[in-house]
Structure formats: structure tokens, C-alpha cells
Amino acid sequence: MIAAFFDLDGTLCTEHVWQAFNKYFTEHHRRRLLVKAFLATHLSLWPLHHLGLVSRTRFFRLWINHMPWLLVGLRPEEGQEIFRWVTDQALIPSLRPDVAEVLRQHQAQGHQVVLVSGAFEELLACLGERLGVQHVVGTRLELNRGRYSGRAIKPCFGPDKVALLTELLAKRGLEVDLSQSFSYGDSVFDVPVLEFVGNPVAVYPDRQLRDYASQRGWQIIGEPKES
């Protein structure tokens, strides 16, 4: 079978997951101190990145590793309420029409579509339901005594995306012809999944991915980002 792997933030959606969660907690007046502390601690790293004191890889890995803090102490059913709100109020409205149409074309051709993202796997499952996508690969949340611990079991980032995707394909018994399959991503951090297939597509790429894709003759969808 032929598969099509889609990244989320910046690729399928313009809204970033952390922005969507911030919007939820702000509008519902919940966990305001926790969210402010999280944003203050992590946004403050961006100037350090520009000064060369924190690598871009470390900056984004810290975000993905620490995002589960926002849900610490919540029960899974409380989490589902948040994931549904984020999906319906933030992610679905921010779908890129052209990329969503590409996804639908893959579905119409009978290709196996998989969402592959650093976002929480439970959130991706909610979005997958709305889009008719059965399989997702994301960051798995740890539970402790029936509540979210604030830690990730396995963050889904960079090369780990390929390992987790391979695990999913084997677990579900999906025999995919990778040489004929497609992958869509917007960031240089998506390169491992893009190179995993025969048809990589850079979508509204950052500068590094734009250059990387151009050198290799990959298809590019949308205007490249300048930053």
C-alpha cells in the first residue's frame, strides 16, 4: 500500500499546538499561573537561541518534552475535553486549505494517511477523527495513578518520529511501499520522516528545509517561511 505522512504544526495547520492550548486555558480561566510560568520559562530561551547559546534543536526539544506539564494532575477524561476543544476551536479552523485538499486526495486514492507530529497522541487522535484519519503517531503522555504525570513516555521529535512511525506500521500490520509513499513537513526537523519515503514534500518550509529541499529537487508547496 501507499501511505501519506502529514506533520501538524505549520504543515497541516497554521495554528501551533502550544498556541491552541494557551487559547483554551486563557478562555476557560484555567491553570493561568502554570501556563504563564511555562511560557515565561520557554519563550525566554528564544533570545538565547538567537545569541547562539541554545541550539534550535534543544529549544524545540525542550518545548516538546515539557508541554505535558500543562496537563499535570488531570484525568484522561478531562484531557479529552481539552483535546476536543483544541481540535474544534483551534486546529480545524486553522487547516491550510491547499494541504487539507492534498490529504483528501490521498484518501480518495485509497492511500493510508497517518498524522505524525510532536503533539500529544491523544490530541492527534481527536483531529484524526475529524479528518477521517485512523492512524496517528505523536508524543505519548504518562499516567500516574490515573492522572497525567506531566511527563512524556516518548517524545515524538526528529529521528524519534521515524522510530515511532516504524513501530506503528509494524504493530498495525501495515505493509507500506515506502518508495512510493509521501511525506509532508514544514521544518528541517521533519527531514527524517521526509527522507523515509520516496516522495518527500516540503510544505511552507522554514529556510533550512527550503534550501535542503531545493538542493534535492523535492516538491515544495506554499511560500517558504522567512524565519
Where are the regions a protein language model picked out?
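Active-site neighborhood of HAD-like aspartate-dependent phosphohydrolases
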Residues: 1-55
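Residue-level detector of alpha-helix boundaries and kinks
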Residues: 6-7, 52, 64, 84, ...
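Electropositive phosphate-/nucleotide-binding environments in soluble metabolic enzymes
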Residues: 15, 61, 73, 158-162
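Small-residue-rich anion-binding loops in enzyme active sites
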Residues: 50-66
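Metal-dependent phosphoesterase signature
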Residues: 61-97
